[in-house]
Amino acid sequence: MAKKRVVIGMSGGVDSSVSAWLLKEQGYEVIGLFMKNWEDDDDSEYCSTRQDWIDAASVADVVGVDIEAVNFASEYKDRVFAEFLREYQAGRTPNPDVLCNAEIKFKAFLDHAMLLGADMIATGHYARVREVTSGPDAGRVELLKAVDASKDQSYFLHRLNQAQLAKTLFPLGEIRKTEVRKIAEQLKLPNATKKDSTGICFIGERPFREFLNRYLSYQPGPMKTPEGVIVGEHVGLSFYTLGQRKGIGLGGMKSHKNTDGNSEPWYVARKDVATNTLYIVQGHDHPWLLSSELSAGQMSWVAGSPPSEELVSAKTRYRQADVACSQRSDADGFSLAFAAPQWAVTPGQSAVLYQGDVCLGGGIINTSAVPA
């Protein structure tokens, strides 16, 4: 019987490299595919694409798999980056990784892999896929959290649909990150000690304000307290996010004291795009930073339809512990009511729903409400 062909996204990082080796060990015919998705500043100090390609090709040679490169820069700009800029211009805080996964890594990439004769695709994400084998949902594919809860990336994958998940393997879903590093060292992979990538999906680490300046128009405006007192000037609403503490420019101001006599820090609490006003508050637990419920749109359900369960758990940001809530959904979106108020629920971010380890899907946060 012919081996199943798996095309794996190889980024030059440790996770995808070890994933390629694991797949080969499991008996698959493995082909590596390196994606180039950003071209605006190939020669800048922040662009790591050349080194990433060298690392990916070197690993492929060690592991013994063929690798090729594909350019999705146009697709990335049209499907991901344009929306990223629109959201920031509207005063929201988007998460490009969510859209990048749905549109590039598991759409453009999947389409290209099929042209290469792939039976399946794979990535180095920490998540799991499971097929339901009995009952009324038999044949349906579920997206599950990774065994390593500290690295779980199901939050970023919640927009994947049944067709995408049915064609996807996550070799690291059952493995802890420490074990992945150990395998890379034992194999003497050239990137065994390479640090994990951070920053904007495929754009990388760079001074964020300087980067946005190149693409967005912005206008300074007033910074106000909830009482309407102007305490400073912001440099443009796009450069701030709810819950932000650093970089506001009011570190020396003192007007509110804790019981120990120290001034409480300022936090970004709201952005009023209509009046170009940034509202800031003092104290981590200020009521304006807490939300008892939220509404979300642009929803995507892993099963293809909204969950029937009313009581679920949710994350409103990556690395947040699941929080208990009740959900109601309709054709326009869904709403969540939290069992306990949540901190800095941010429009533009994703609210992702879970039932235990099963990721149900989610949507983009539109609004949130402070506790009554």
Swiss-Prot record:
Annotated catalysed reactions: S-sulfanyl-L-cysteinyl-[protein] + uridine(34) in tRNA + AH2 + ATP = 2-thiouridine(34) in tRNA + L-cysteinyl-[protein] + A + AMP + diphosphate + H(+)
Its biological purpose: Catalyzes the 2-thiolation of uridine at the wobble position (U34) of tRNA, leading to the formation of s(2)U34.
Official protein name in the record: tRNA-specific 2-thiouridylase MnmA
Active-site residues, record numbering mapped to chain: 100 (nucleophile), 201 (cysteine persulfide intermediate)
Primary location group: cytoplasm
Interaction with tRNA: annotated span: 151-153, 317-318
Location within or outside the cell: Cytoplasm
InterPro entries on file: MnmA-like (IPR004506), MnmA-like_C (IPR046885), MnmA-like_central (IPR046884), MnmA-like_central_sf (IPR023382), Rossmann-like_a/b/a_fold (IPR014729)
GO molecular function list: ATP binding; tRNA binding; tRNA-uridine 2-sulfurtransferase activity
EC number(s) on file: 2.8.1.13
Site positions for Interaction with tRNA: 125, 349
Entry's Gene Ontology BP terms: tRNA wobble position uridine thiolation
This protein's UniProt keywords: ATP-binding, Cytoplasm, Disulfide bond, Nucleotide-binding, RNA-binding, Transferase, tRNA processing, tRNA-binding
GO cellular component: cytoplasm
A Pfam family assignment: tRNA_Me_trans_M
Family label: Belongs to the MnmA/TRMU family.
Disulfide bridge positions per record: 100-201
tRNA processing is among the record's keywords: yes
Chain positions recorded as ATP binding sites: 9-16, 35, 124
